[in-house]
């Protein structure tokens, strides 16, 4: 948005980009709806840039993303996958998930995660609360050098808890078999997003056996 004039060593900023940078604010140039209509992948990119840079989207930009979120499905699965891989990289993976949800895009690209937002867990084991809170907490703990598949293992390891939730007579919450059902769900999600067979196998097997890892000594 800025034009640098070498002769006078000055920057001509006709769209207020310098001010937005100083205030850590994300804004499209011109009408947000028009910019997103030019390439619907920009809807996801707006979320990724906000997460990566720790910026806030200005109201009109965020409103346009929310209004147009459904159009992201017009973008190829491969392009969506590549953008999500960048979004869920540490150290901004947890904020990326939150912004994806708040923007309405989570419901479009990873709708299977939506039920985790309200899925309660036993406070004895999960004082952090819902399955969604558990997932975002784990994402926030990922090391920056984590392999690209690891955030996806975290995202999907408890994906089946909402559909397997039961409550005992004593009031305890259980999720019997969620790891096996979750592995099947994870495979379908990753295939839909056109992950490679090698990536799918690694993530799915980790989801399938993650309850055994907690007992390892």
Residue spans for each PLM region:
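Glycine- and charge-enriched loop/helix tracts that form the active or gating conduit
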Residues: 1-155, 159-177, 181-201, 209, ...
């Amino acid at each position: 948005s800025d034009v640098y004039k070498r002769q006078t060593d000055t920057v001509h900023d006709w769209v207020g980009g310098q001010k937005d940078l100083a205030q850590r604010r994300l804004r499209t140039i011109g009408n947000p709806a028009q910019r997103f209509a030019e390439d619907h992948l920009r809807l996801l990119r707006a979320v990724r840039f906000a997460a990566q840079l720790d910026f806030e989207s200005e109201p009109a930009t965020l409103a346009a993303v929310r209004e147009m979120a459904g159009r992201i499905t017009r973008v190829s699965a491969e392009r969506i996958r590549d953008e999500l891989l960048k979004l869920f990289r540490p150290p901004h993976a947890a904020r990326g998930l939150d912004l994806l949800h708040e923007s309405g895009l989570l419901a479009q690209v990873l709708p299977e995660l939506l039920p985790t937002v309200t899925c309660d867990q036993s406070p004895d084991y999960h004082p952090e609360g819902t399955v969604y809170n558990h997932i975002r907490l784990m994402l926030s703990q990922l090391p920056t050098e984590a392999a690209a598949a690891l955030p996806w293992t975290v995202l999907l390891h408890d994906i089946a808890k909402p559909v397997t939730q039961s409550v005992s007579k004593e009031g305890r919450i259980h999720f019997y078999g969620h790891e096996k059902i979750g592995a099947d769900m994870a495979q379908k999600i990753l295939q839909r997003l056109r992950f490679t067979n090698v990536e799918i196998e690694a993530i799915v097997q980790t989801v399938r056996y993650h309850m055994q890892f907690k007992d390892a000594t």
